Amino acid sequence: MKNLTSSELRKIYLDYYKSKGHAVISSASLIPENDPTVLFTTAGMHPLVPYLLGEKHPAGNRLTDVQICVRTGDIEEVGDPTHCTFFEMLGRWSLGDYFKEYAISCSYDFLLNHLEFDKDKFAVTVFKGDEDCPRDDESAEFWKKMGVPEDRIFFLPKENNWWGPAGVTGPCGPDTEMFIDTGKPKCSDECSPACDCGKYVEIGNDVFMQYFKNADGTFSPLKQKNVDEGMGLERMLCILNGYKSVYETDLFKPAIALIENLSGHKYDESETVTKAMRIIADHIRTSTFLIGDVKGIVPSNVDQGYILRRLIRRAVRFGRIIDLPERSLSKIAEQYISQYQDVYQYLLTNKDRIVLELDKEEIRFSNTLQQGLKEFEKVITHIPTKTISGKTAFRLYDTFGFPIEMTEELAHENGFEVDVQGYEDAFKEHQKKSQAGAEQKFHGGLADNSEETAKLHTATHLLHSALMKVLGGEARQRGSNITAERLRFDFGFDRAMTADEIKAVEDLVNEQIKKNIPVVCEEMTVDEAKAQGAIGIFDNKYGEKVKVYTIGDFSKEICGGPHANNTGDLKSFKITKEQSSSAGVRRIKAVIGQ
């Protein structure tokens, strides 16, 4: 195996697939563009779903990238040797071009000949088949053809070797996963990569999207067969360098060294200190990327902002355990900005914002943390049972800013449980008028591709342009959510709009609607789009060519669509509400055609 740095591994991977005819594309934002079902980009394939479904990608049908991702389902697991909330995914795709044989040959060649993994320790898994879809004998035969012996090819069920669909229906298919045998003894005669005994460590997988799952549960062959390869950068570095923990890699070492200096503690002096430093290093890396993202997430009590707040406050709590001085979190973020700025330049561009938001949130929570911890100690000392009531948990949240997950974590550390349902009931009762609402959370993007949502999508472009004309350039989009009934649009602005400003924005939009202006879509290079003054998230678009939607001389944005044919289709535009979304972000709700 090659001992590599993170920079070397990124370069080797992208250069390899570039040599195989793949276009290198940029990482997308951590906030999905048009997917209202999730908070974050959680996998390399996430931004490419439209192209996996058949839409032509501007860069072609062979792509490769390093996609930044956030997964927060296991926040409480962070602190062990392997879990991270932020990670980079090395990925490559074939969009209706090559399929299993060439994909497998590339994976084998890259892993064994370029990264120099031991051929004698290499093992793979393939789909064993079930009543819905046949056994993936094709992949098994191609692995044999590459020289993998039959006793190191394992057939496993859907729970191990199948991807998708993302929803009830959609593209899906078998995958083949690649492993290295660590040399540990078998846990049983049936020991395989499906075990969690640690004998086998995954180093990559290829997903073969060849089926479409229908609403009735049946599967049909896809017209366009796709390949999606994924290899986690952090995990791969850990394995290649023989580390026991991802926190030993060069992605975390500088931050942990800084935490040691700031706290006066050594990383390996105790399990408690090691865990605390891992949590702080992970959570501040993720927070740095979320705040620095082109969509600029800030701590709040809803959606992405809530996750960000939860990460920062968890880091503050564990910082107290290791005597981390106040305002240390922003210093750790500055270390990450310096470390990543050559790869993700926007972190340096947004450095001031990152430092400001981290300092603000750390100071805000530090002021109540100690009081809250004292109150928690009183609670567990005096309650007669081992369950903290929902009302008490809500009081800790409402008075001291303890996210429910923090209260649960503290409770479990002390042998208590929390009545989470009771907390949720108390929260709903208190938050009936919460801007997030009780029934629908704001995740951003389009709810569907109906004619009405297409019109409302066009309305968001008109609104975006009108806001910047009335309020200035700071009023850039921070997020959007569109259903068939209304649009919701978040934008950067540090105060409530006046009645005159709201009317001015409405008048500007309605003026464009009355003009019945055609909505024109063109494909062009990113440089051409920039030269024409198009609004876009230039650090996070794919390939050399992009779609640009133009509405006369009023609006020009890089966008994936869909849109109305002309502005007259909207009939009219009305702002129904203007309110705060979070610190420095305002939210508008609006309707059309009424």
Question: Locations of the language-model features?
Answer:
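A glycine- and charged-residue-rich anion-binding loop/surface
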Residues: 1-594
